[in-house]
Design a protein with these regions (language model features):
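Conserved, mostly hydrophobic/aromatic
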Residues: 6, 18, 46, 59, ...
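Structured C-terminal cap/extension of enzyme domains
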Residues: 39-47, 191, 195-366
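Glycine/proline-rich, positively charged
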Residues: 26, 40, 86-208
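Active-site mouth loops of central-metabolism enzymes
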Residues: 19-29, 76-95, 121-125, 220-229
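Active-site beta-loop-alpha junctions enriched in small/polar residues
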Residues: 21-23, 49-51, 75-79, 115-118, ...
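Generic structural signal for well-ordered alpha-helices
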Residues: 3, 35, 56, 60, ...
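N-terminal binding-site loop/beta-alpha segment at the start of enzyme catalytic domains
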Residues: 1-76, 80, 141
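Short hydrophobic/aromatic-enriched beta-strand-loop microsegments
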Residues: 69-72, 166-175, 268-275
Length: 366
């Protein structure tokens, strides 16, 4: 397992976590075994916006004795009073739900307390007016909530809430379908979504990824907007390549599904190549690097995807990205303009010219 550091909290978080949308489907015995295997395999981050309330005692049974090794993100607004998932902006309901979750998880603290499911500005206004944000802040002062998160599918709302509140982690729906305008939660333009990634990277706000497979749509050739099924591994790699991403949270409910996720690190590079998405990217995305590294190997040894990522972040004002760029073994000035990458790029990026542009830009920064 590989890990990434949340710059705002210092937490060391596994690149692959577990979402709980259907954890309950494995039943107590099967799901407990799956969760124990996940932690044994190095997974340490778990989202608890569960599809059913029965997931919480499963987590409590499976992980209560491993609590100091894991992180929970718990949502203030998720209501399980009816048994299944519900959404509420009523403070009394939210308070009772969080207390119930903690009791069933057999824990007394929350690693990341989330401002839950804010998809419209009116949601945020009601959330604050009803005192739910104040509730989270009070619990943070008491040490019950360690850090504050936000879950949303809408770039404009995310930007507004990040302006208004101090956020340490964002839960955002990230996959190639949504990023290029296809799917139920494909909110915001390609550029607006990219701005969220870049802002989070710049400000040190980690992103945990929900819906990495677009609800399974991307795994089915008939449903996929790309006309071809992607694998779970391609979707995970795509998400991890976006700026700001700390962890991807696929669902799982049994050991077999967990083992399949853990096998991500055993895959050859070609199994992770998601460049097929170029078949359906919009015109405004053509000519823009998506860091897929389909252009590898570079004859001069450049990591073209990473060089592009640092450049995009630097232009967005991320000073740390400039320092990271300068520590690369080979940078844009080492490009020999052989054209190998230009001929291989499925997104029609003239990388040879771009390397000259990047080199000049980075050298201009003192």
């Amino acid at each position: 397992m590989n890990y990434r550091i949340n710059k705002r909290t210092g937490d060391r978080i596994s690149e692959i976590g577990i979402g709980s949308a259907y954890m309950y489907a494995g039943g107590m015995d099967g799901a407990v075994k799956a969760l124990r295997r996940a932690v044994e395999g190095g997974i340490n981050y778990f989202d608890l916006a569960a599809g059913d309330g029965s997931s919480f005692p499963i987590y409590g049974e499976a992980l209560h004795d491993l609590r100091d090794r894991i992180f929970y993100q718990i949502h203030f607004g998720a209501d399980y009073s009816a048994g299944t998932y519900g959404w509420s902006l009523e403070p009394d309901v939210v308070k009772r739900s969080v207390e119930w979750q903690l009791k069933n998880l057999r824990t007394d603290y929350i690693d990341y307390g989330f401002i839950h499911c804010q998809d419209e500005i009116s949601d945020w206004e009601t959330y604050r007016e009803n005192g739910i944000l104040d509730m989270i802040l009070k619990l943070k002062k008491m040490g019950v909530v360690h850090h504050i998160g936000l879950s949303s599918h809408t770039p404009g709302v995310i930007q507004r809430i990040m302006d208004d509140a101090e956020i340490d982690m964002l839960m955002f729906s990230v996959n190639p379908a949504y990023d290029y305008g296809h799917g139920e939660y494909a909110n915001g333009s390609t550029d607006e979504r990219a701005e969220v990634y870049k802002r989070c990277e710049k400000e040190g706000v980690g992103i945990s990824v929900m819906k990495p497979f677009s609800g399974g749509q991307l795994l089915d050739a008939e449903q996929s907007p790309f006309g071809k099924a992607l694998t779970q591994y391609q979707c995970i790699k795509y998400a991890l390549d976006r700026p700001g991403i700390l962890t991807v949270l696929p669902g799982a409910s049994n050991i077999e599904e967990v083992e399949h996720l853990l096998a991500y690190y055993d895959q050859p590079e070609e199994a992770l190549d998601y460049s097929v998405i170029s078949s359906l990217t919009p015109k405004e995305a053509s000519g823009k690097c998506v860091y897929c590294n389909h252009c590898k190997p570079c004859p001069a040894g450049l990591d073209i995807g990473l060089i592009n990522k640092y450049y995009d972040l630097a232009k967005a004002g991320d000073a740390l990205a400039v320092e990271h760029y300068r520590t690369l073994e080979k940078n844009a000035s080492d490009c020999i303009s052989c054209g190998h990458c230009d001929s291989r790029c499925p997104f029609h990026v003239n990388q040879s010219a771009r390397m000259q542009e990047i080199s000049a830009y980075m050298e201009s920064i003192k």
